[in-house]
UniProtKB/Swiss-Prot annotation:
The active site is at 104 (phosphoserine intermediate). GO terms for biological process: carbohydrate metabolic process; peptidoglycan biosynthetic process; UDP-N-acetylglucosamine biosynthetic process. The lineage of its organism: Bacteria, Bacillati, Actinomycetota, Actinomycetes, Kitasatosporales. PANTHER family: PHOSPHOGLUCOMUTASE (ALPHA-D-GLUCOSE-1,6-BISPHOSPHATE-DEPENDENT), PHOSPHOHEXOSE MUTASE. This is Phosphoglucosamine mutase. Binds 1 Mg(2+) ion per subunit. It is an enzyme of class 5 (isomerase). GO terms for molecular function: magnesium ion binding; phosphoglucosamine mutase activity; phosphomannomutase activity.
């Protein structure tokens, strides 16, 4: 069996790859692994379970709850909430485990399972590996040790989670948003209720789009992966900025008053300067990934800030932040982690802080984001190739070396197998867009030739 866990939990097509049987089995295995690790010692274990609004979340939620309760874990069902809300509630309610059912920005047919440890942090890789091993052991015949009678878990609907999460967001906002007009695109996802509520409570005038989830329309032509509607709405309504979330609202992209995109790198740059001003940017350091634009690194250096780079995936950004005590990190895709206030990327918190900076300074988001100049960057996804051989193919290594010689010091190349999808990402930065496109196209062809 290949590794089930990717960089962001377990994902696949619901009811094909991610079945009710798999969801149930992994949940039972997670309960047993945490019990064996001593997490439940001395008390009756509790788990928080939430989901995004996609239709398959309903039967997968039932399977996860059945698995946990059958393993003796009491379950608090918080319903449809963003991933960062489930992580926050896992910590705030003192739960031993959190489970989020979502495939984030993926299309509606997909779904996923993400586990959070006590405190709301993602499970460590070694615990995920152990869950897989225990699941596989019992899938092939070993019986579970099952509690009976009063030992089985109880299931309770917990309806206060949304209000608790929004109250938390209000408590960490540095200033109000009075006088600011914001367009919110909620991707017909998990933040369709809480994000507009939070911005309204903070004093902003809001226009909301993509906030009518029906279980089928999540991420469909809207949200952080499809910004066209948000751009148009910002210009139409004369808004100060627009905020886009994905299906589970763990990421945030923005649009300035002209309709131009402000990506995760630019958001990090704006927040880094704001946090330094408040003496909240510990060690004057920002953590980002190898996918961050070279312009971000140059901007941070110019502003006298340090820049630490990690592998792609917000879990690796978070690990670096936790290990060294850094306060701010994130990804170009819009995952932004403010570790003093969240244990994972939080799109609503990020959007609130970005709007707060606009309100506090009186400057436009366009002006604030100009602190960094994005170098032309081209990203090409190459599907249906053997992504496991990216680092071992001699043919591909030769093609990369030739590209790097052509780009010189004014560009860079990155080939990366996706952690959540069956494809290889080719990223090229160059001094001009035509060169970046040309090199990226040749490298994409080389990937197909070498790994197809």
């Amino acid at each position: 069996m290949g590794r089930l866990f990717g960089t962001d939990g377990v994902r696949g097509v619901a009811n094909a790859d991610l079945t009710a049987e798999l969801a149930l089995g992994l949940s039972v295995a997670a309960a047993h692994v945490l019990a064996e690790a001593g997490t439940f010692e001395g008390h009756r274990p509790v788990a928080v379970v939430g989901r995004d609004p996609r239709a398959s979340g309903e039967f997968l939620e039932a399977a996860v709850v059945a698995g946990l309760a059958s393993a003796g874990v009491d379950v608090l069902l918080v319903g449809v909430l963003p991933t960062p809300a489930v992580a926050h509630l896992t910590g705030a309610l003192g739960a031993d485990l959190g489970v989020m059912l979502s495939a984030s920005h993926n299309a509606m047919p997909d779904n996923g399972i993400k586990f959070f440890a006590r405190g709301g942090h993602k499970l460590a890789d070694d615990l995920e590996d152990r869950i897989e091993a225990v699941y596989e052991e019992h899938r092939t015949g070993a019986p579970w040790d099952r509690p009976t009678g009063a030992g089985v878990g109880r299931v309770t609907s917990y309806g206060e989670g949304a209000d608790q999460y929004v109250a938390h967001l209000m408590s960490v906002l540095p200033n109000r948003l009075d006088g600011i007009k914001v367009v919110l695109d909620e991707a017909h996802g998990a933040a369709a209720r809480v994000s507009p509520d939070a911005f309204t409570r903070a004093g902003a005038e809001i226009i909301t789009i993509g906030a009518e989830p029906d279980g089928l329309n999540i991420n469909d032509g809207c949200g952080s992966t499809h910004l066209a509607k948000l751009r148009a709405a910002v210009v139409e309504h004369g808004a100060d900025l627009g905020i886009a979330h994905d299906g589970d609202a763990d990421r945030c992209l923005a649009v300035d008053h002209t309709g131009a995109e402000v990506d995760g790198d630019q958001i990090l740059a704006v927040l880094a300067l704001a946090m330094r001003e408040r003496s909240a940017l510990r060690s004057d350091t920002v953590v980002a990934t190898v996918m961050s634009n070279l312009g971000f690194k140059l901007a941070m250096e110019r502003e006298g800030l340090s820049f630490v780079q990690t592998a792609v995936g917000d879990r690796y950004v978070l690990e670096e932040m936790k290990e060294h005590g850094y306060a701010l990190g994130g990804e170009q895709s819009g995952h932004v982690i403010i570790l003093d206030h969240a244990t994972t990327g939080d799109g609503t918190l990020t959007g609130l802080l970005l709007a707060a900076r606009v309100a506090q300074t009186g400057r436009t988001l366009q002006d604030l984001a100009s602190v960094m100049e994005r170098l032309p960057q081209v990203l090409v996804n190459v599907p249906d190739v053997d992504r496991a051989r990216v680092k071992t193919s001699a043919e591909l290594a030769t093609a990369v070396a030739e590209a790097e010689r052509e780009l010189g010091a004014t560009g860079r190349v990155l080939l990366r197998p996706s952690g959540t999808e069956p494809l290889v990402r080719v990223m090229v930065e160059a001094a001009d867009i035509e060169q970046a496109r040309s090199v990226a196209g040749r490298l994409a062809d080389a990937v197909k030739s070498a790994l197809g």
